[in-house]
Amino acid sequence: MQTLADLLNTIPAIDPAAMSRAQRHIDGLLKPVGSLGRLEALAIQLAGMPGLNGVPHVGKKAVLVMCADHGVWEEGVAISPKEVTAIQAENMTRGTTGVCVLAAQAGANVYVIDVGIDTAEPIPGLINMRVARGSGNIASAPAMSRHLAEKLLLDVICYTRELAKNGVTLFGVGDLGMANTTPAAAIVSTITGRAPEEVVGIGANLPTDKLANKIDVVRRAITLNQPNPQDGVDVLAKVGGFDLVGMAGVMLGAASCGLPVLLDGFLSYAAALAACQMSPAIKPYLIPSHLSAEKGARIALSHLGLEPYLNMEMRLGEGSGAALAMPIIEAACAIYNNMGELAASNIVLPGNTTSDLNS
């Protein structure tokens, strides 16, 4: 059986030759060079991903939502009852939540995965990959053992790879877990080196008078657990959560297949920071869907070197932003594959890099 280290070593590099060919192809399309802006850059990025074989395209689409509870909820860092995690996960199986509606609009399947919900029995309709009934309270103990973190990473990587074998070429990640912006902020603070007060936000409408406590909880968690910012697994195990581990696993699994993965919001940025510490080779496969309204979002994205495509003032999580951005990926593929070429037309644009065809 493959180990986590074995799988991390399988992540292929982006193909620069394929990207150069894509650049030449796009420059020859029926438009001024560069006039489709970031859509062009996105198409070129996709062309470099080995899993797409040099031609940007979208097959099946999947949003994987990692659901888990967090022991740190006990510290008063969230206003919603912990039971909401399980209730909302059940709602996802009925297709009535935000991510389900947006994914259906995008033609994507939603996979609701229990990686650590705190219920006595598994919830019917969920994919059961639970490793524990919620993580430890990071304010007083590690979130989990390194062994559990590595086990869940490996399980999710393998599951993601199976979906790829069955035709999924575009992945999105999502999260569900009460109080999970607290461990996410702890991860962002640890890896970026920024102070907790710079990255801790209100999450799911935490009253501002409770924000100081949340900041203190994050600071205590980091001081107590001493996560190594250079070791992504260590950070996830000490101050993360099972949903964050699961999202990192999707990113690593998709990248190991040479396929793109759409990030969602703040939770996914934190998971991406940890995943990139495990394997910097995954970064070109990460596509930032939107700018989360959560405090600390820009800090995390800046550290990742990513610029989101949308700014919708969203902070729902669930994978809602990833689902919303899927048509942008399809649009980039469409211009690459379906636009006409200048060489086959009567239009000549010598040295024209800025004007549009009507100027």
Curated annotation (Swiss-Prot):
Active site positions, chain numbering: E318
Top-level taxon in the UniProt lineage: Bacteria
EC number: 2.4.2.21
SUPFAM superfamilies per the UniProt record, alphabetical: Nicotinate mononucleotide:5,6-dimethylbenzimidazole phosphoribosyltransferase (CobT)
Pathway the protein acts in: Nucleoside biosynthesis; alpha-ribazole biosynthesis; alpha-ribazole from 5,6-dimethylbenzimidazole: step 1/2
Class of the enzyme per the UniProt entry, highest EC level: transferase
GO BP terms in the entry: cobalamin biosynthetic process
Signal peptide: none
UniProt xrefs under InterPro entries: Nict_dMeBzImd_PRibTrfase (IPR003200), Nict_dMeBzImd_PRibTrfase_bact (IPR017846), Nict_dMeBzImd_PRibTrfase_N (IPR023195), Nict_dMeBzImd_PRibTrfase_sf (IPR036087)
CDD domains: DMB-PRT_CobT
Reactions accelerated catalytically: 5,6-dimethylbenzimidazole + nicotinate beta-D-ribonucleotide = alpha-ribazole 5'-phosphate + nicotinate + H(+)
Subunit structure: Homodimer.
Family label: Belongs to the CobT family.
Role noted for this protein: Catalyzes the synthesis of alpha-ribazole-5'-phosphate from nicotinate mononucleotide (NAMN) and 5,6-dimethylbenzimidazole (DMB).
Protein name, UniProt field: Nicotinate-nucleotide--dimethylbenzimidazole phosphoribosyltransferase
Originating species: Shigella sonnei (strain Ss046)
